[in-house]
Amino acid sequence: MIYDTDRDSLKKKFRIADKVIDYLNHDDNGLNIIIGSDGDPFASLVYRYLMKHAPNKGSVRYSIQTNGLLIKKMMLRFSNVFNNLQMLQVSIDGATKDTYEKIRLGGKWEKIKENMEHISKVKDQYHFLWHFDFVVQRDNFREIPMLLEWADRLGVDAVNLKPIEDWNTYTDIKQYQVWKKDHPDYDEYNSIMNSVKDHPKIAHRNFHWTLT
């Protein structure tokens, strides 16, 4: 859906988008539409088309999952969606420039900071919930306390801490699974997680995969 450039495939997806838009325009039962989860929707021609033509009405609410790099520019372009936004989830896997740009390839730390500051300023205008999604792994677990401090300052409603999963991206996923007891950084990781486990911003309190 996100990065498809094949002409025939795109035509098919635009037709599907048209059917979704038509359904949304005629439904008044109350719907929550999730936009994203398979890449950044603001980088997708199909998702942009869907958001451009999505209805601006109270019975249809939207939730967006994004990496946040394009969001400031897109908020005005798709005001019909943001006027009815229920939740904004931003994937942020680092709280410093070096870590963020190492993990989020192609990401620019200054741009994500600028965009998060913008959301912080306009969030109350749109009345949506704002979550950070943070995929915990070896290269970023030490920055969890910093991320929580940043979330507090910005007014983020919740921080979702999620373990890294094996998407066949790494040749040895075990070296990144810092929550496993046989990992060389486990003790340090466990100490950090215990220090933040009661933080009010942490949304998922099921830490069976994190704590002993």
Label the model's feature ranges.
Residues 3-18, 26, 52, 59, ...:
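Radical SAM enzyme [4Fe-4S]-AdoMet core and its adjacent flexible, acidic
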Residues 21:
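Conserved alpha-helix/loop element of class I SAM-dependent methyltransferases that forms part
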Residues 25-33:
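LRR N-terminal entry segment and analogous cap-like coil->beta motifs
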Residues 32, 61-63, 87:
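Conserved LRR concave beta-strand detector
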Residues 41-42, 67-71, 94, 137-140:
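Short beta->alpha connector loops
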Residues 46-47, 74:
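Acidic donor-diphosphate engagement hotspot in glycosyltransferases and nucleotidyltransferases
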Residues 47, 64, 69:
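Conserved SAM-binding loop
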